[in-house]
Amino acid sequence: MLSPFLQTYRAHVTERAALGIPPLPLTAPQTGELIELLKNPPQGEEAALVEMITHRVPAGVDDAAKVKASYLAAVAHGSEKCPLLSPAKATELLGTMLGGYNISPLIELLDDAALGAVAAAGLKTTLLMFDQFHDVKDKADKGNEHARAVLQSWAHAEWFTSRPELPQSIKLTVFK
């Protein structure tokens, strides 16, 4: 039987699609419900649940992002188990959150032998570091190779140079 949360969410998606607009991002309470389903996924819904935690929760400092980052950090650190997300996948997803609540867990994971490289990959494309740049620098100064790689990546602006090249021309319509 489909959970009430998934039924409501799918009705919302259908309603918004009929209007030609995307579904709204998940709220913090909805993200909490999604996490409960991730812990014990209904058969046949596994891919949909992973897609939702990956793409339907806003990044940054939104309340839902805080719930998502907290759960992914717990999975990455091993204090929570998720049959659909390995610690490496949880760390990878933290790396896609652009900044905010994901930064501290990613910096902590730089010290993890198994996940440090994954955390570094996420931090290399994250610019919204705020005051935590110094935490990465301190780790690099103490010999953490993953932190050093992050600093080198930022220094070489790989977050920018790794992006696809813009086309030679872009056709636009300007309305006055």
Where are these regions (language model features)?
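Short, charged early-sequence alpha-helical segments and their helix-coil boundaries
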Residues: 43-56, 62-70
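Eukaryotic acidic, Ser/Thr-rich intrinsically disordered low-complexity regions
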Residues: 6-9, 138-176
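Alpha-helix N-cap/helix-start positions at coil->helix boundaries
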Residues: 43, 80-85, 100, 112-117, ...
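Conserved hydrophobic register position within alpha-solenoid helical repeats
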Residues: 45-49, 86-90, 119-123, 147-155
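Amphipathic alpha-helical scaffolding segments comprising HEAT/armadillo-like alpha-solenoid repeats
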Residues: 28-35, 59-78, 97-111, 128-140, ...
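Amphipathic alpha-helical packing elements
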Residues: 2-35, 40
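Charged, low-complexity interaction regions
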Residues: 21-25, 42-44, 61, 79-83
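Structural signature of alpha-helical solenoid repeat scaffolds
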Residues: 50-57, 95, 111, 124, ...
